[in-house]
Amino acid sequence: MACSSSLSSKWASWGASSRPHPSVQPFVTRKNVVRYHKPTSELSYSPLTTTLSSNLDSQFMQVYETLKSELIHDPSFEFDDDSRQWVERMIDYNVPGGKMVRGYSVVDSYQLLKGEELTEDEAFLACALGWCTEWLQAFILVLDDIMDGSHTRRGQPCWFRLPEVGVVAINDGVLLRNHVHRILKKYFQGKPYYVHLLDLFNETEFQTISGQMIDTICRLAGQKDLSKYTMTLNRRIVQYKGSYYSCYLPIACALLMFGENLEDHVQVKDILVELGMYYQIQNDYLDTFGDPDVFGKTGTDIEECKCSWLIAKALELANEEQKKILSENYGINDPSKVAKVKELYHALDLKGAYEDYETNLYETSMTSIKAHPNIAVQAVLKSCLEKMYKGHK
C-alpha cells in the first residue's frame, strides 16, 4: 500500500473502487450509516464526487468505502474471490455501525482545533484516522463478544454467532487489528507524527487488552467472590478496558494531527480518561436498565458475573441480608435469579445513584474544562462531554 503524493485526486480516482455495488442491499439503516448485508466480487461502481460534501456523514462514509476497497485489494496479499468477499463482508458487518462516536470525534476535534474549514487532504486524513479508531473498536468487540459468549451486537447476531463464521471470528478480529496499521502506514508514514500515532495505538491496545484481562479473570468459572467487587476494582476495569480507547484515543489522534505534543496535554488526558470511565459506567447502566430495542444488544452483565458499576454500587449500599441475596443470585444464567438481582437494584435505587454520579461528573468535568487555558481545547473537551452526557436518554 504505497502512499500517493497527493490525496486531493483520491476523491475521484478511487471512486471507481470505493462505493458499494448496486446489488448490495442495505439491511440495517441508521441516521448516520447504511450497512450492507453481503459483499460482491463484481465491481461496477459510480465515481465519487471530487468536492467534499458539507455533510460529515457522507464524507465519512466515502472514506470508509475507499479504505475498505484498498484493504481488500491490497497487493501484499493475493486475494482470490472467496477471501476478498469474506473480508469485505466481515468489515461491513463489524466496522461501521453503532454511534461511531470515536471516529466522528477525531474529525470534529481536528476541525475545532484548526478553527477553520479543512482542506480536502486534511478532511480525508482526519476521516481516515477516525476510521482507524473504529477499526480498532471492531477488533476489540469481535473478540470481546467471543469471550463473553454474547448473542447480539448493534441489533444483529454477533459475528461469531453466524453459522458460517464460528471460531474463524478470532482470526477475523486479529485481521481487523492489522488493518489499522495498514491504513496508518499508507496515509501517515511520511508525517512527522507517524511514530507517535503508532505508539498511541499500540499503547491504547495494550491498556484495553489488559483491562479486558482484569475484567475476565475476576469472574473465572467457579471462583465467584463478590467481596472483591468493589468500586475500586470497577474503576480500574473501566479505566483500562474502555476509557483510553473510547475517549482519549480519538482526541489524542486529533492533537497529534494538529502538531501537538501529547506530553504537553496531561490535564487533557486526565479529563478524557475520567469521561471515558463515565462512558463505560453508562454502558454498565444501560446493560441492565436500557431498552435492548433501542441500544441494539441484550444485556448479560448479571448472568456473566461482571464487576459492573451497578453490582459494585449495590454491594456498597446493601445490608447483610441484601448482600446474601446478591451472592445467591448474581452470576447465574437463570432468568428468575436475574430478576431477583434487578429487583434488588430497584430497591437500592441504583437509578438514582447513577443519576447523582452522572450529574456530579458533568459539573466537575465542566469546571475542569473551563479552567483549561486554550479555548480551542476547551471546545474539543466540551464537545466530547456533550456527546456522552445522558446518552441513555
Curated annotation (Swiss-Prot):
Major location (coarse): plastid
Binding positions (Mg(2+) 1): D144, D148
What does the entry comment about cofactor binding? Binds 2 Mg(2+) ions per subunit.
Gene Ontology molecular function, alphabetical: (2E,6E)-farnesyl diphosphate synthase activity; chrysanthemyl diphosphate synthase activity; dimethylallyltranstransferase activity; hydrolase activity; magnesium ion binding
The residues that the entry says bind dimethylallyl diphosphate 2 are R153, K241, Q280, D287, K306
* One Pfam family matching this protein: polyprenyl_synt
Q: Where is the transit peptide?
A: 1-53
Q: Enumerate the residues binding Mg(2+) 2.
A: D144, D148
State its cofactor.
Answer: Mg(2+)
In the record, which residues are listed under signal peptide?
none
**Which residues are listed for dimethylallyl diphosphate 1 binding in this entry?**
K99, R102, Q137, R154, K297
Q: Where in the body, by tissue, does this protein show up? A: Restricted to glandular trichomes during achene maturation. Expressed in flowers and in both ray and disk florets.
Q: Which UniProt keywords apply?
A: Chloroplast, Hydrolase, Isoprene biosynthesis, Magnesium, Metal-binding, Plastid, Transferase, Transit peptide
**Record keyword Cell wall biogenesis/degradation present:** no
Q: Where in the cell is it found?
A: Plastid, Chloroplast
Where does the record place Low complexity bias? Answer: 1-18
Q: Which SUPFAM superfamilies match?
A: Terpenoid synthases
GO BP? farnesyl diphosphate biosynthetic process; isoprenoid biosynthetic process
EC number annotated for this UniProt entry? 3.7.1.-, 2.5.1.67
Pathway(s) per entry: Isoprenoid biosynthesis
Catalytic activity annotation = 2 dimethylallyl diphosphate = (R,R)-chrysanthemyl diphosphate + diphosphate; (R,R)-chrysanthemyl diphosphate + H2O = (R,R)-chrysanthemol + diphosphate; (R)-lavandulyl diphosphate + H2O = (R)-lavandulol + diphosphate
UniProt site positions, description: Required for catalytic activities = N283
- The superkingdom listed in its UniProt entry is Eukaryota
> What does the UniProt record say this protein does?
Component of the monoterpenoid pyrethrins biosynthesis; pyrethrins are widely used plant-derived pesticide. Catalyzes the condensation of two molecules of dimethylallyl diphosphate to produce chrysanthemyl diphosphate (CPP), a monoterpene with a non-head-to-tail or irregular c1'-2-3 linkage between isoprenoid units. In a second step, hydrolyzes the diphosphate moiety of CPP to form chrysanthemol. With a lower efficiency, can also converts dimethylallyl diphosphate into lavandulyl diphosphate (LPP), and subsequently LPP into lavandulol.
This chain belongs to which protein, by name?
A: Bifunctional chrysanthemol synthase, chloroplastic
Species name: Tanacetum cinerariifolium
Q: Which gene encodes it?
A: CDS
